[in-house]
Amino acid sequence: RTRSFGDALKSDNNIRIIAEIKKASPSLGIIREDFNPVEIARIYEASGAAAISVLTDEKFFQGCLSYLTDVKKSVNLPILRKDFIVDAYQIYEARSAGADAILLIAALLSKEEIQRYLELAGELDMDCLVEVHSETELKKVLQTNAHIIGINNRDLATFKTDMETTLQLRPMIPAGKIVVSESGIKTRADVEKLMKEGIDAILVGETLMKSNNISTKLHELLGLINHKDTKSTK
């Protein structure tokens, strides 16, 4: 049985955090030298993350599927496979590796493919986080059964992040969908701005991976400690 990714992101009061495990990125290169996925996952779980995203792309992010399998065995949170999924095979592969959810990137897929992959994932008891970066992509996704919509603040052409992307696209998403803001979220002030706009969850990777104290940073983002006390963790 899978763990429900969608249910983990529902909350009445505080935002839910999908904490991401990634060793490297195209824009930054190696982000974290002392990279132990299982250890990081355990810190995430103990520090209040609602779900964990694991980068499994090898070429750009130095990830691998075995990271996901190892993480799944070591925590009780739902696990998202973060990768460039362009083929049904990768969806079966994700399920067999232990994923509870997969990322579908609207920019890479046609409306028909998104719908087909949503249905396949559903048959395999997995949720999908369907990611958009523009109004055109969002309109395409809203013509499918996507239930969890991620707004990526990072422009994949320039790698720059801008939270305005979330603020612009959020009002176009109908009630009843779970909305996730991804990338470029660094402080509790950022989180509070997103909560005001009705964002259910955020996906945070680099901010946590670059932190000297992952647990403190996660607590700060969740508003569990006063961010003025955390200058040393920057």
Regions inferred by a protein language model and the residue ranges of each:
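N-terminal amphipathic alpha-helix/helix-capping segment at the start of soluble metabolic enzymes
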Residues: 1-22, 26-27
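N-terminal active-site wall of soluble small-molecule enzyme domains
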Residues: 16, 28-129, 135-140, 166-169
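Catalytic cores of alpha/beta
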Residues: 86-97, 134-144, 181, 185-204
